[in-house]
């Protein structure tokens, strides 16, 4: 007589899993990529005592994705106009100047330049 279900022995470390009823295949969940942890880190740098709701995080993530796509698209177009196959920091900088308005573009360019300088000196 063969047992139909596995029984865990006393003191065993592994948990016994119930058999899968449908097809027997394990489903792999697709991971959702997000800027959430980075948004949270920046929030804590600027306002350490402030939190963020999950809905606000979704909106911020959508905003970052939108800006990223706009800058990537514009810098791609600029590279094509100049017959270049590589997007450099110069194309990114020009795209930021074209997309973001006035003072916001100046701040973004200065922060971007600072980040590139920090990256190149750390190598």
UniProtKB/Swiss-Prot annotation:
Cross-link Glycyl lysine isopeptide (Lys-Gly) (interchain with G-Cter in ubiquitin) placement: 118
InterPro entries: Histone-fold, Histone_H2A/H2B/H3, Histone_H2B, HISTONE_H2B_site
Family under the similarity heading: Belongs to the histone H2B family.
GO function term, MF aspect, one: DNA binding
Keywords annotated in UniProt: Chromosome, DNA-binding, Glycoprotein, Isopeptide bond, Nucleosome core, Nucleus, Ubl conjugation
Quaternary structure note: The nucleosome is a histone octamer containing two molecules each of H2A, H2B, H3 and H4 assembled in one H3-H4 heterotetramer and two H2A-H2B heterodimers. The octamer wraps approximately 147 bp of DNA.
Domain of life: Eukaryota
Function: Core component of nucleosome. Nucleosomes wrap and compact DNA into chromatin, limiting DNA accessibility to the cellular machineries which require DNA as a template. Histones thereby play a central role in transcription regulation, DNA repair, DNA replication and chromosomal stability. DNA accessibility is regulated via a complex set of post-translational modifications of histones, also called histone code, and nucleosome remodeling.
Biased composition (Basic residues): 10-30
Post-translation changes: Monoubiquitination of Lys-118 gives a specific tag for epigenetic transcriptional activation and is also prerequisite for histone H3 'Lys-4' and 'Lys-79' methylation. GlcNAcylation at Ser-110 promotes monoubiquitination of Lys-118. It fluctuates in response to extracellular glucose, and associates with transcribed genes.
Protein name: Histone H2B.2, embryonic
Annotated stretches, region: Disordered: 1-30
One of the record's GO cellular component terms: nucleosome
Compartments (UniProt record): Nucleus; Chromosome
PANTHER family per record: HISTONE H2B (PTHR23428)
Taxonomic source organism: Psammechinus miliaris (Green sea urchin)
Glycosites: 110
Keyword Nucleus found: yes
